[in-house]
Amino acid sequence: MNDSQTIIDAGKEFDFGKTSADYARFRDIYPDVFYEQLTSRNLCINGQSVLDVGTGTGVLPRNMYRFGAKWTAVDISAAQIEMAKLLSQGMDIQYLVSPTEKLKLPKGSFDVITACQCFWYFDHEKTAPLFHSLLSPGASLAVMCMEWLPYEDTIAGASEELVLKYSPQWTGAGEIVHPIRIPECYSDHFETVFHNEFKVKVPFTRESWNGRMKSCRGIGASLSPAEIEEWEKEHIQLLSEIAPERFDVLHYIAFVELKSKIT
Protein backbone atom coordinates (compact mmCIF):
# COMPACT_ATOMS: atom_id res chain seq x y z
CA MET A 1 0.00 0.00 0.00
CA ASN A 2 1.80 3.09 -1.23
CA ASP A 3 -0.93 5.74 -1.42
CA SER A 4 -0.37 7.97 1.57
CA GLN A 5 -3.84 9.51 1.12
CA THR A 6 -5.46 6.20 2.08
CA ILE A 7 -6.71 6.00 5.68
CA ILE A 8 -4.87 2.90 6.82
CA ASP A 9 -7.23 0.03 7.70
CA ALA A 10 -10.09 2.53 8.17
CA GLY A 11 -8.42 3.69 11.35
CA LYS A 12 -8.18 0.24 13.00
CA GLU A 13 -5.34 0.14 15.52
CA PHE A 14 -2.27 -1.97 14.84
CA ASP A 15 1.05 -2.57 16.58
CA PHE A 16 3.89 -4.40 14.85
CA GLY A 17 5.44 -4.87 18.28
CA LYS A 18 2.83 -7.60 18.83
CA THR A 19 4.41 -9.62 16.03
CA SER A 20 8.10 -8.87 16.58
CA ALA A 21 9.16 -12.52 16.88
CA ASP A 22 7.45 -13.54 13.64
CA TYR A 23 8.51 -10.28 12.00
CA ALA A 24 12.15 -11.01 12.79
CA ARG A 25 11.93 -14.62 11.66
CA PHE A 26 9.88 -14.29 8.49
CA ARG A 27 10.31 -10.78 7.05
CA ASP A 28 14.03 -10.69 6.37
CA ILE A 29 13.32 -11.83 2.81
CA TYR A 30 14.59 -9.12 0.48
CA PRO A 31 16.75 -10.47 -2.37
CA ASP A 32 20.16 -8.98 -3.15
CA VAL A 33 18.71 -6.96 -6.02
CA PHE A 34 16.65 -5.04 -3.45
CA TYR A 35 19.76 -3.75 -1.70
CA GLU A 36 21.47 -3.15 -5.03
CA GLN A 37 18.93 -0.39 -5.68
CA LEU A 38 20.78 1.57 -3.01
CA THR A 39 24.39 0.67 -3.76
CA SER A 40 23.95 1.19 -7.51
CA ARG A 41 23.01 4.79 -6.68
CA ASN A 42 26.05 5.12 -4.37
CA LEU A 43 23.81 5.20 -1.33
CA CYS A 44 24.43 3.62 2.10
CA ILE A 45 28.08 2.92 1.39
CA ASN A 46 31.41 3.45 3.16
CA GLY A 47 31.90 6.96 4.52
CA GLN A 48 28.19 7.84 4.66
CA SER A 49 26.01 8.43 7.70
CA VAL A 50 22.56 6.88 7.20
CA LEU A 51 19.29 7.21 9.11
CA ASP A 52 16.77 4.39 8.63
CA VAL A 53 13.27 5.45 9.69
CA GLY A 54 10.56 2.91 10.48
CA THR A 55 13.31 0.33 10.82
CA GLY A 56 11.18 -2.40 12.41
CA THR A 57 13.56 -5.21 13.37
CA GLY A 58 16.43 -3.51 11.56
CA VAL A 59 16.29 -5.53 8.36
CA LEU A 60 17.73 -2.78 6.17
CA PRO A 61 20.66 -1.62 8.33
CA ARG A 62 21.59 -5.19 9.24
CA ASN A 63 21.74 -6.32 5.62
CA MET A 64 23.42 -3.12 4.40
CA TYR A 65 25.97 -2.99 7.23
CA ARG A 66 28.56 -4.84 5.13
CA PHE A 67 28.78 -1.88 2.74
CA GLY A 68 30.43 0.27 5.39
CA ALA A 69 27.99 3.08 6.18
CA LYS A 70 27.40 4.32 9.73
CA TRP A 71 23.78 3.50 10.61
CA THR A 72 21.24 5.06 12.96
CA ALA A 73 17.83 3.36 12.99
CA VAL A 74 14.55 4.41 14.58
CA ASP A 75 11.16 2.83 15.15
CA ILE A 76 8.08 3.78 17.14
CA SER A 77 7.88 0.28 18.68
CA ALA A 78 10.15 -0.54 21.62
CA ALA A 79 9.53 -4.26 21.02
CA GLN A 80 10.71 -3.97 17.43
CA ILE A 81 13.85 -2.10 18.49
CA GLU A 82 14.66 -4.68 21.16
CA MET A 83 14.44 -7.40 18.53
CA ALA A 84 16.58 -5.31 16.16
CA LYS A 85 19.27 -4.96 18.83
CA LEU A 86 19.21 -8.70 19.47
CA LEU A 87 19.63 -9.48 15.78
CA SER A 88 22.36 -6.83 15.36
CA GLN A 89 24.77 -8.06 18.01
CA GLY A 90 28.32 -7.30 16.95
CA MET A 91 27.23 -4.50 14.61
CA ASP A 92 27.76 -0.83 15.45
CA ILE A 93 24.20 0.33 14.75
CA GLN A 94 22.58 3.00 16.92
CA TYR A 95 18.91 2.24 17.60
CA LEU A 96 16.34 4.74 18.86
CA VAL A 97 12.71 4.37 19.95
CA SER A 98 10.69 7.34 18.71
CA PRO A 99 7.93 8.31 16.32
CA THR A 100 9.72 9.48 13.19
CA GLU A 101 7.87 12.79 13.33
CA LYS A 102 9.34 13.54 16.78
CA LEU A 103 12.98 12.72 16.09
CA LYS A 104 15.45 15.01 17.85
CA LEU A 105 18.74 14.67 16.01
CA PRO A 106 21.33 17.24 14.86
CA LYS A 107 20.49 19.10 11.68
CA GLY A 108 22.46 18.18 8.59
CA SER A 109 23.90 15.07 10.22
CA PHE A 110 22.99 12.45 7.59
CA ASP A 111 24.05 11.74 4.02
CA VAL A 112 21.11 9.40 3.36
CA ILE A 113 17.72 8.73 4.92
CA THR A 114 16.07 5.41 4.08
CA ALA A 115 12.40 4.49 4.49
CA CYS A 116 11.80 0.82 3.73
CA GLN A 117 8.29 -0.63 3.79
CA CYS A 118 7.01 2.18 6.02
CA PHE A 119 6.71 5.45 4.09
CA TRP A 120 2.89 5.45 4.01
CA TYR A 121 2.66 5.52 7.82
CA PHE A 122 4.21 8.96 8.24
CA ASP A 123 2.60 12.36 8.74
CA HIS A 124 4.21 13.78 5.61
CA GLU A 125 3.51 17.42 6.38
CA LYS A 126 5.86 16.91 9.34
CA THR A 127 8.37 14.45 7.90
CA ALA A 128 9.07 16.31 4.64
CA PRO A 129 10.68 19.34 6.35
CA LEU A 130 12.14 17.14 9.09
CA PHE A 131 13.95 14.87 6.63
CA HIS A 132 15.24 17.93 4.76
CA SER A 133 16.62 19.41 7.98
CA LEU A 134 18.34 16.17 9.00
CA LEU A 135 20.08 15.71 5.65
CA SER A 136 23.20 17.51 4.52
CA PRO A 137 22.69 19.78 1.46
CA GLY A 138 22.06 17.75 -1.68
CA ALA A 139 21.80 14.47 0.22
CA SER A 140 19.29 11.71 -0.58
CA LEU A 141 16.03 10.33 0.73
CA ALA A 142 15.50 6.76 -0.51
CA VAL A 143 12.07 5.13 -0.28
CA MET A 144 11.65 1.40 -0.95
CA CYS A 145 9.10 -1.37 -0.78
CA MET A 146 8.52 -4.94 -1.92
CA GLU A 147 4.94 -6.21 -2.28
CA TRP A 148 3.40 -9.48 -3.42
CA LEU A 149 1.20 -9.38 -6.52
CA PRO A 150 -2.16 -11.03 -5.71
CA TYR A 151 -3.64 -10.72 -9.20
CA GLU A 152 -0.63 -12.38 -10.84
CA ASP A 153 0.25 -15.02 -8.24
CA THR A 154 -2.33 -17.65 -7.25
CA ILE A 155 -0.89 -18.42 -3.81
CA ALA A 156 -0.51 -14.75 -2.90
CA GLY A 157 -4.05 -14.04 -4.04
CA ALA A 158 -5.53 -16.89 -1.99
CA SER A 159 -3.60 -15.91 1.14
CA GLU A 160 -4.63 -12.29 0.72
CA GLU A 161 -8.30 -13.27 0.48
CA LEU A 162 -7.98 -15.11 3.78
CA VAL A 163 -6.44 -12.06 5.45
CA LEU A 164 -9.40 -10.00 4.24
CA LYS A 165 -11.83 -12.58 5.62
CA TYR A 166 -10.48 -11.95 9.12
CA SER A 167 -9.52 -8.30 8.65
CA PRO A 168 -11.89 -6.78 6.05
CA GLN A 169 -10.73 -3.22 6.77
CA TRP A 170 -7.11 -4.04 5.92
CA THR A 171 -5.91 -1.70 3.17
CA GLY A 172 -2.75 -3.64 2.31
CA ALA A 173 -4.49 -5.72 -0.35
CA GLY A 174 -4.76 -5.39 -4.12
CA GLU A 175 -1.21 -4.39 -5.03
CA ILE A 176 -0.18 -3.88 -8.65
CA VAL A 177 3.16 -2.70 -9.99
CA HIS A 178 3.37 1.09 -9.68
CA PRO A 179 5.80 3.81 -8.65
CA ILE A 180 5.85 4.86 -5.02
CA ARG A 181 3.67 7.92 -4.66
CA ILE A 182 5.49 10.87 -3.13
CA PRO A 183 3.11 13.44 -1.58
CA GLU A 184 3.20 16.92 -3.04
CA CYS A 185 4.49 18.45 0.20
CA TYR A 186 7.90 16.90 -0.47
CA SER A 187 8.36 19.02 -3.59
CA ASP A 188 9.15 22.05 -1.44
CA HIS A 189 12.18 20.26 -0.04
CA PHE A 190 13.15 17.50 -2.48
CA GLU A 191 13.47 16.68 -6.16
CA THR A 192 12.80 13.16 -7.46
CA VAL A 193 15.90 12.10 -9.39
CA PHE A 194 15.35 8.36 -9.96
CA HIS A 195 12.78 5.63 -9.62
CA ASN A 196 12.61 1.97 -10.57
CA GLU A 197 9.91 -0.71 -10.44
CA PHE A 198 10.32 -4.36 -11.43
CA LYS A 199 9.04 -7.85 -10.66
CA VAL A 200 10.95 -10.48 -8.72
CA LYS A 201 10.24 -14.04 -7.57
CA VAL A 202 10.84 -14.63 -3.86
CA PRO A 203 11.31 -18.21 -2.58
CA PHE A 204 9.26 -19.56 0.32
CA THR A 205 8.29 -22.76 2.06
CA ARG A 206 4.77 -23.28 3.36
CA GLU A 207 6.07 -22.44 6.84
CA SER A 208 7.89 -19.26 5.82
CA TRP A 209 5.01 -17.97 3.67
CA ASN A 210 2.57 -18.63 6.49
CA GLY A 211 4.91 -16.71 8.79
CA ARG A 212 5.21 -13.85 6.31
CA MET A 213 1.43 -13.54 6.06
CA LYS A 214 0.92 -13.97 9.79
CA SER A 215 3.29 -11.06 10.48
CA CYS A 216 1.41 -8.67 8.20
CA ARG A 217 -0.52 -5.72 9.56
CA GLY A 218 -3.91 -7.32 8.89
CA ILE A 219 -3.17 -10.38 11.05
CA GLY A 220 -0.39 -10.41 13.63
CA ALA A 221 -0.27 -6.67 14.22
CA SER A 222 -4.01 -6.17 14.73
CA LEU A 223 -5.99 -9.34 15.55
CA SER A 224 -6.49 -10.93 18.96
CA PRO A 225 -4.48 -14.05 19.85
CA ALA A 226 -7.58 -16.21 19.39
CA GLU A 227 -8.29 -14.70 15.98
CA ILE A 228 -4.67 -15.15 14.91
CA GLU A 229 -4.77 -18.80 15.96
CA GLU A 230 -7.99 -19.40 14.02
CA TRP A 231 -6.63 -17.63 10.93
CA GLU A 232 -3.37 -19.58 11.07
CA LYS A 233 -5.13 -22.95 11.24
CA GLU A 234 -7.16 -22.04 8.18
CA HIS A 235 -4.16 -20.65 6.33
CA ILE A 236 -2.01 -23.72 6.96
CA GLN A 237 -4.83 -25.91 5.67
CA LEU A 238 -5.19 -23.66 2.61
CA LEU A 239 -1.49 -23.91 1.80
CA SER A 240 -1.55 -27.69 2.15
CA GLU A 241 -4.19 -27.73 -0.58
CA ILE A 242 -2.82 -25.17 -3.06
CA ALA A 243 0.95 -24.94 -2.55
CA PRO A 244 3.87 -27.36 -2.83
CA GLU A 245 6.33 -27.49 0.06
CA ARG A 246 8.61 -25.01 -1.75
CA PHE A 247 7.47 -22.33 -4.16
CA ASP A 248 8.10 -18.79 -5.38
CA VAL A 249 5.76 -15.85 -4.84
CA LEU A 250 5.77 -13.07 -7.41
CA HIS A 251 6.48 -9.65 -5.90
CA TYR A 252 7.47 -6.26 -7.23
CA ILE A 253 10.15 -3.95 -5.91
CA ALA A 254 9.75 -0.19 -6.06
CA PHE A 255 12.49 2.34 -5.33
CA VAL A 256 12.60 6.12 -5.52
CA GLU A 257 15.45 8.52 -4.73
CA LEU A 258 14.82 12.15 -3.84
CA LYS A 259 17.57 14.76 -3.59
CA SER A 260 17.42 17.36 -0.86
CA LYS A 261 17.08 20.84 -2.33
CA ILE A 262 19.80 23.28 -1.37
CA THR A 263 18.21 26.33 0.24
Describe the function of each predicted region.
Residues 103-112:
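A short acidic, Gly/Pro-enriched loop at the edge of an enzyme's catalytic core
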Residues 132, 137-202:
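Conserved catalytic/acceptor-binding region of the Class I
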Residues 51, 57-102:
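Class I SAM-dependent methyltransferase SAM/SAH-binding core
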Residues 2-45:
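Conserved class I S-adenosyl-L-methionine
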Residues 122-131:
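A short, conserved alpha-helix within the catalytic core of class I
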Residues 125, 180-263:
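Conserved Class I S-adenosyl-L-methionine
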Residues 112-116, 124:
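A short beta-strand submotif of the Rossmann-like class I SAM-dependent methyltransferase core
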